[in-house]
Amino acid sequence: MTEQPIPATFGVDHVGLSVRDLASTRAFFCDCLGWRVIGERPDYPAAFVSDGHDMVTLWQVEAPDRAVAFDRRANIGLHHLALAVADRAGLDALYERVAKWPGVVVEFAPELSGKGPKIHFMIREPSGVRIEFAFDPRLEEARKQR
């Protein structure tokens, strides 16, 4: 039996997303989700946003009118970004806010993920990137036990 190596990593540093409209996606993350801009690269252009735990880099595509949307069933790459929500009430309140946000397309409202107990909903943010928001009561219990 081969010995399992010790992991050389300890988490995700950031996720980079190419977006059609940097301004509307940045507004979605900051004004709708409450994230903060922690850096920018106007020459690219790009914005670095964070919720205090995770960082997402938003990269403006060069030619938005010629950008090709990601087909999750045909392309290799990021299927969706999944963000955790602390509790069920927070998930429901977030859904109400996100569903009304300009340019957001709701794929489905909060529902069980498979047979549960995780509850999630899926949207496309204003640039078309799929984002899942999820609450898992098993993680809530684990956090309480710390």
Where are these regions (language model features)?
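Short helix-capping and inter-helix turn/linker motifs at the boundaries of alpha-helical repeat units
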Residues: 6, 71-72
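N-terminal beta-strand motif that seeds the catalytic metal site of vicinal oxygen chelate
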Residues: 1-23, 78-83, 137-146
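Core segments of cupin and vicinal oxygen chelate
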Residues: 18-62
